[in-house]
C-alpha cells in the first residue's frame, strides 16, 4: 500500500513521513482538489480554492502545510473555521497527517475553558485551528503569537461571512506577517470575500472543482412525497433503516420539534443546533458516537465538520435552499 500511495502522490513531491501518514490514514490517490492545490502550495503560491465539504479540501491544504513547517515549538500556521465542530475535525485530520513529522495541531473555540487551551498552547503546537472570535481572544491575551506565522488558511470563508465573522477575519489578517502564504477555501465567492482576497493575498492561483466533481457517485439518492412528513419518516425508519443516520432540518425550532416527535415515538434521537452550549453539544455527539443515540437531527451549520464512522443514511427532512448545501449535507 505504501508503494501505491507513493506512486499516486509521487508527482506531488511529498516526503516519506507524509506518505507514511497518508498510508496509515487509508489514502489511495489524491482527489482533484488535492492534485491541483498541493503543488501550488509547495511552490509558495497563495491559493483560492472553490470546493465543498467532501472533496478532500482539508488534506489539500493540510498536507502541504505540514510538509512546509518545522517541529519547532512556535505556531507557524493559523487556520480559521466557521464552527467549533469543523475546527475539531480539521485539527484531528491535520494531527493525523503530521503525526510522523511530530507536528501538533490544536483546536481553539468558544464554549471550552480558555485556561485549558492556554496550557495546551504553552506546551508547544505548530498549527492552531479555531473560530475567529476565540482566535482574537488568544491573540489579545498574547497566548497566540503571530510572529512566526508562515501560513493562514481560511476554511469555508463564505460560511464565516454568513455568520458575521468578516470583521474578525480582517482583524486577524491585517496583523499577520507580510511574508506568509494565504490559502482561502470557499464554496461561493461573494463580494466581501473577493475584497479580502484582493487586499490580503498575493497573486493567488485559482483552483475550482466543478459541480460534476462535487457529487458523490457512491451515494444512492431517493426522493419521497408524503402528506405527513413525520409519519412518512417513521415508516421509512421502521422499514428501511438499520444504522446511524443524520436528519437535516432548516431551523433550530425544526430540530427541536422533530427530536421531541421522534423521542415520543420511542426513537433514540438527539438534536444539534447552535443554541446548545458546548457541554450539551459534546454530550449529544458522545451519545451519537457511542450508539446511545442512533439518530442525529441537525441544522446545516451545526453539522459542519461532523466526522462519524458508519453513517448509513442522510435524510433531508427539509430541502436545503441551494445545491451547495445539499452537497455539504450528503458528502
Positions of PLM-derived features:
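Conserved helicase RecA-like core
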Residues: 2-330
Amino acid at each position: 500500500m505504501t508503494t501505491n500511495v507513493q506512486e499516486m502522490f509521487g508527482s506531488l513531491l511529498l516526503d516519506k513521513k507524509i506518505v507514511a501518514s497518508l498510508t496509515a490514514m487509508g489514502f489511495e490517490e489524491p482527489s482533484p482538489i488535492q492534485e491541483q492545490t498541493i503543488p501550488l502550495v509547495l511552490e509558495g503560491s497563495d491559493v483560492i480554492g472553490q470546493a465543498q465539504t467532501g472533496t478532500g479540501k482539508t488534506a489539500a491544504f493540510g498536507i502541504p502545510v505540514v510538509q512546509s513547517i518545522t517541529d519547532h515549538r512556535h505556531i507557524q500556521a493559523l487556520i480559521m473555521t466557521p464552527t467549533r465542530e469543523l475546527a475539531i475535525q480539521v485539527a484531528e485530520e491535520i494531527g493525523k497527517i503530521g503525526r510522523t513529522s511530530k507536528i501538533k495541531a490544536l483546536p481553539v473555540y468558544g464554549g471550552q475553558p480558555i485556561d485549558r487551551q492556554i496550557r495546551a498552547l504553552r506546551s508547544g503546537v505548530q498549527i492552531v485551528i479555531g473560530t475567529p472570535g476565540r482566535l482574537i481572544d488568544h491573540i489579545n491575551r498574547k497566548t497566540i503569537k503571530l510572529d512566526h506565522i508562515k501560513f493562514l488558511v481560511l476554511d469555508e470563508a463564505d460560511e464565516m461571512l454568513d455568520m458575521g465573522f468578516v470583521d474578525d477575519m480582517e482583524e486577524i489578517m491585517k496583523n499577520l506577517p507580510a511574508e506568509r502564504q494565504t490559502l482561502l477555501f470557499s464554496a461561493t465567492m461573494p463580494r466581501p470575500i473577493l475584497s479580502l482576497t484582493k487586499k490580503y493575498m498575493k497573486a493567488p492561483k485559482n483552483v475550482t472543482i466543478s459541480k460534476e466533481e462535487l457529487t458523490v457517485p457512491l451515494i444512492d439518492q431517493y426522493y419521497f412525497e408524503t402528506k405527513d412528513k413525520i409519519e412518512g419518516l417513521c415508516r421509512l425508519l421502521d422499514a428501511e433503516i438499520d444504522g446511524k443516520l443524520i436528519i437535516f432540518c432548516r431551523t433550530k425550532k425544526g430540530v427541536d420539534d422533530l427530536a421531541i416527535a421522534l423521542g415520543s415515538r420511542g426513537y433514540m434521537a438527539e438534536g444539534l443546533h447552535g443554541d446548545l452550549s458546548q457541554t450539551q453539544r459534546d454530550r449529544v455527539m458522545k451519545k451519537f458516537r457511542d450508539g446511545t443515540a442512533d439518530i442525529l437531527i441537525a441544522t446545516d451549520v451545526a453539522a459542519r465538520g461532523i466526522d462519524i464512522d458508519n453513517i448509513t443514511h442522510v435524510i433531508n427532512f427539509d430541502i436545503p435552499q441551494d445545491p451547495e448545501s445539499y452537497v455539504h449535507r450528503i458528502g
